[in-house]
């Protein structure tokens, strides 16, 4: 599947959000490229909505066509479309790996999933967009457990801030999906109502 592979810090500055997590270059200059200092240009309503949509896309590493499908599905579900959209994005396997602390960034999590290092309910899954469900069990494959990265991840789990809807067993790196998250449980600087307004035009 196609994905954005360009300079992430520049994209973070344009959208005014750290797409990497701990990006020091972004922290030093959290304003769009080409702007001097913190001066801001007055933006149209459409541009603000577009930027919020792009922020969501690049945060979760989703291409435009796939993002439109997520929105259409969220819009067809009961409840608030914006909440549904964020929950669908959070349920991606690569995001769950990131949230559980087994990857530093979503981009790294996407790579780990693509390389076939995980199983879901005993079945190997190498599709980052795979949607997890309540009570799913995610494991690192036996042949992957010896990788240096997973040794380091195991050590780092002691300090990991794992959301309440997930549980990680540090000794085995097993991830248990207790439930899909509610919007209030998702810590992300996103104004999803602006995305709804963008697609409602």
Curated annotation (Swiss-Prot):
One of the primary rRNA binding proteins, it binds directly to 16S rRNA where it nucleates assembly of the body of the 30S subunit. With S5 and S12 plays an important role in translational accuracy. Pfam families: Ribosomal_S4, S4. Part of the 30S ribosomal subunit. Contacts protein S5. The interaction surface between S4 and S5 is involved in control of translational fidelity. It comes from the Bacteria. It comes from Corynebacterium urealyticum (strain ATCC 43042 / DSM 7109). PROSITE patterns: RIBOSOMAL_S4 (PS00632), S4 (PS50889). One of its GO terms (molecular function) is rRNA binding. Residues 91-151 form the S4 RNA-binding domain. GO terms for biological process: ribosomal small subunit biogenesis; translation. The keyword RNA-binding applies. Belongs to the universal ribosomal protein uS4 family. Signal peptide: none annotated. This is Small ribosomal subunit protein uS4. The gene is rpsD. NCBIfam families: PRK05327.1, rpsD_bact. The keyword RNA-binding applies. GO terms for cellular component: small ribosomal subunit. Keywords: Ribonucleoprotein, Ribosomal protein, RNA-binding, rRNA-binding.
């Amino acid at each position: 599947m196609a994905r954005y592979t360009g300079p992430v810090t520049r994209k973070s500055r344009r959208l005014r959000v750290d797409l990497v997590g701990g990006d020091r270059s972004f922290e030093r200059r959290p304003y769009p490229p080409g702007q001097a200092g913190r001066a801001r240009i007055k933006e149209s309503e459409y541009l603000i909505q577009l930027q919020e949509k792009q922020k969501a896309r690049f945060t979760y590493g989703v291409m435009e066509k796939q993002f439109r499908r997520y929105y259409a599905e969220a819009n067809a579900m009961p409840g608030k479309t914006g909440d549904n959209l964020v929950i669908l994005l959070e349920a991606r396997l690569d995001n769950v790996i990131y949230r559980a602390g087994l990857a530093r960034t979503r981009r790294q999590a996407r790579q780990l999933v693509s390389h076939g290092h995980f199983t879901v309910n005993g079945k190997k899954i190498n599709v980052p967009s795979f949607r997890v469900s309540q009570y799913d069990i995610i494991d690192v494959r036996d042949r992957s457990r010896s990788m240096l990265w997973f040794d380091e991840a195991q050590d780092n789990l002691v300090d990991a801030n794992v959301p309440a809807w997930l549980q990680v067993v540090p000794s085995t790196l097993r991830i248990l999906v207790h439930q899909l998250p509610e919007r209030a449980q998702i810590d992300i600087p996103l104004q999803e109502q602006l995305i709804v307004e963008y697609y409602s035009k």
